[in-house]
Amino acid sequence: MRMYDIILKKRANVPLTDEEIRFVIDGYVKGDIPDYQVSALLMTIVFNGMSARELGTLTLAMAQSGHMVDLSSIDGITVDKHSTGGVGDKTTLMIGPLVAACGGKVAKMSGRGLGHTGGTIDKMESIPGLKVSLEQDDFIAQVNKIGLAVIGQSEGLAPADKQLYALRDVTGTVDSIPLIASSVMSKKLASGAQAILLDVKVGSGAFMKTLDDARALAKAMVDIGNENGRSVKAVLTDMDRPLGHAIGNALEIREVIDTLKGHGPQDLTHECLIMAAHMLVLSHICDYETALSQVQDALDSGEALERLRLMIEAQGGNIHVINDESLLAIGKFTYDVTAPQDGYITHMNTEQCGIASVMLGAGRTVKDGPIDYSAGIVMHKKTGDSVICGESIATLYASDESLIPNAAKTYVEAITFGTTAPTVVDTILDIVE
């Protein structure tokens, strides 16, 4: 079997066999196939796409290039959730406790912030003492005991994906639905969960800017799951405005706790309840209507908040953050962004809002760079809200006062004002299954 022939075959838009796909991934990881040949194949995939079978095989081969987590010793169906990345997206830390409180088994491996989007692991590390790295046996034992564990992704997961992504990044092959889908799902397959809920963000703060592109990505990822015996569902959610009120790390943990106490923003609460209900359905615990009722009860009764407390305790964190938000760091320098006129906020460039938060220190400007857990933004007004000239629409927080002016300028430029109230869409845009 020759890589040259495989490239020519795919260039002619002839589907590759499972053996050919595995040959490519195995050879590339071992160093037997050079970058320039894999680059050529990637470009043929960009132009010609892949069938559901090809994509399923490619993704499994990528997953099997490294450690495959075995969760079979967890009682019940294990369920995972993945977000394609957004601004103010702290949903994992609400949905996990909601699902666990209703009998689900949430075994979640999460990532760090990427570009303008935040990362669940960064947010969790703003809780004093909390560990985001567990041995596999401890991870499994925790899920069996309290129904929930969230840890950082292992370096050994899907190494082929890491190699391929680095190559795609410099060869103009990042923007491809099949290649994006295989990248995401290779790590999900390797993580071991039997059921996966995908939160595919759409809009100015998402990597998928249009609903059509988001649907295509969602369908590709669901197909990959089906090809590999996983139960997968995708929820398409709006990211034309940040989710909730807080952007940052400790600020978002404060909002998670407030929301699980029943005092959170309506959009965040609504989105989390719906996604948690879908995860219960994927777990074969109950039907959707029953699931909605159960997760609402878990929120109202405080049982979901208790599951968050149990997870923090199990992972070595300070459980007193639940009732004492002063234990969660907040930037000592603040600045209020004010409305320049009476009227409404008619649009938010959500990506720019996320960038403003990064500029305050809440995200990284270089890989593995430092992060300020206390920095970020609390929004008092969002798209569709009425404003009065001079009132605060957002408060910026930073530990370094010199970072505020440029971040404030970026945030101001992200907001559009008008005299007519805009139409605000529901946060849930579509379901793909």
Task: List where the protein language model places each region.
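Short acidic, glycine/serine/threonine-rich loops at helix termini
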Residues: 92, 110, 117-122, 154, ...
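Phosphate/diphosphate-binding glycine-rich loops and adjacent basic-rich segments that engage nucleotide
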Residues: 144-193
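Acidic, glycine/proline-rich low-complexity segments that act as flexible tails and inter-domain linkers
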Residues: 1-88, 307-318, 432-433
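A glycine-rich helix N-cap at a beta->alpha junction
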Residues: 123-149, 219-225, 229
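Alpha-helix C-terminal capping segments
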Residues: 47, 93-107, 187-192, 227-228, ...
